[in-house]
């Protein structure tokens, strides 16, 4: 299995705005151009035909529409600016905000910043900066159903926990309950994650494009489907890590530089949560210099002072007690 995993890793390759004009350019030139058409008739009454000039009523209607639109945009700019939200930055990232009625925007702001939801303005600004769709999503047919789903179906315990979940993953507010959130919830429950309220950040992830491919990756390393799934059940945060930027380099270091069995990550999938450069490599090199090999949890989970103390105790001439966690430590010959 180790050779199969190494072969797979060595052959794998790393995988890897809307620009909207400023307000000063928001003008509409809908006036038809004057036309000049020579009269080819032989009639002597007129050599030239009079230019086609738009009627006064058409010009007035166009002007009124333009002025109304600009007035609406200006009102939204002033309103959002009063909340500390940069309107021009938002429309550059999310142009539909331009055509959203001010009353609809105000309704969303009121709902999210007053009881029972009761986000502070600072928190609300952060939500909007990360999820501008919040301001343009229909309140009654989208935003409220998302909130209701999180509280009733996912089992988020309280409004406080709801705010925490949305602070951590504002994109939840842009997701469809029927097409995104509920299918992902069912998938997580099906693989044995029975406390989804603790992992709401995963609900915005695509099952087909993100969750399943990560389980498949460990199957290709030689793990059974059951073992790979159990690893994600034990440590659901593993779904959030990149295959190319996290799994692959850390597994290569584990097997090639550390000389460990790939199956160690089955029991300690938290291995992938530690920085390769700042934690894994320095700890391994310190152990190698002393000629010892710790279990991965002992090597990585303790703070720096605790790790150094453990290393010194292990290298002492007196053996550890049988009840000590160091009894599993292997000393390299």
Swiss-Prot record:
Compartments (UniProt record): Plastid, Chloroplast stroma; Plastid, Chloroplast stroma, Chloroplast nucleoid
Keywords: Chloroplast, Plastid, Transcription, Transcription regulation, Transcription termination, Transit peptide
A molecular function GO annotation: plastid PEP RNA polymerase core enzyme binding
Disulphide linkage map: none
Record-linked InterPro entries: MTERF, MTERF_sf
Function: Transcription termination factor required for chloroplast gene expression and protein synthesis in chloroplasts. Necessary for chloroplast photosynthetic complexes assembly by modulating the accumulation of photosynthetic proteins. Essential for embryogenesis.
Record-stated family: Belongs to the mTERF family.
Name recorded for this polypeptide: Protein SEEDLING LETHAL 1, chloroplastic
Gene: SL1
């Amino acid at each position: 299995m180790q050779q199969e995993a190494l072969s797979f890793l060595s052959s794998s390759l790393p995988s890897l705005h809307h620009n909207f004009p400023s307000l000063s350019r928001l003008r509409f030139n809908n006036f038809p151009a004057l036309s000049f058409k020579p009269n080819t008739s032989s009639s002597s009454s007129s050599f030239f035909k009079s230019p086609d000039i738009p009627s006064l009523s058409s010009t007035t209607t166009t002007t009124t529409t333009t002025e109304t639109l600009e007035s609406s945009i200006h009102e939204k700019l002033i309103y959002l600016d009063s909340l500390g939200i940069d309107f021009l930055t938002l429309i550059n990232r999310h142009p539909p905000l331009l055509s959203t009625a001010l009353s609809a925007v105000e309704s969303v702001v009121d709902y999210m910043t007053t009881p029972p939801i009761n986000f502070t303005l600072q928190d609300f600004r952060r939500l909007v900066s990360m999820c501008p769709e919040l301001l343009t999503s229909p309140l009654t047919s989208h935003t409220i159903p998302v909130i209701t789903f999180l509280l009733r179906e996912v089992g988020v315990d309280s409004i406080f926990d709801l705010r925490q979940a949305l602070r951590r993953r504002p994109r939840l507010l842009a997701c469809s309950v029927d097409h995104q959130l509920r299918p992902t919830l069912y998938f997580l429950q099906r693989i044995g994650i029975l406390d989804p309220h603790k992992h709401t950040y995963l609900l915005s992830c695509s099952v087909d494009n993100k969750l399943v491919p990560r389980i498949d990756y460990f199957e290709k390393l030689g793990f059974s489907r059951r073992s790979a799934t159990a690893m994600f059940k034990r440590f659901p945060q593993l779904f959030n890590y990149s295959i190319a930027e996290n799994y692959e380099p850390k597994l290569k270091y584990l097997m090639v530089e550390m000389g460990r069995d790939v199956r160690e990550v089955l029991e300690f999938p938290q291995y992938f949560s530690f920085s390769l450069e700042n934690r894994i490599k320095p700890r391994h090199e310190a152990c190698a210099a002393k000629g010892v090999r710790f279990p991965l949890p002992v090597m990585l989970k303790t703070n720096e002072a605790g790790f150094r103390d453990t290393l010194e105790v292990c290298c002492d001439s007196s053996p550890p007690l049988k009840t000590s966690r160091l009894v599993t430590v292997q000393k390299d010959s």
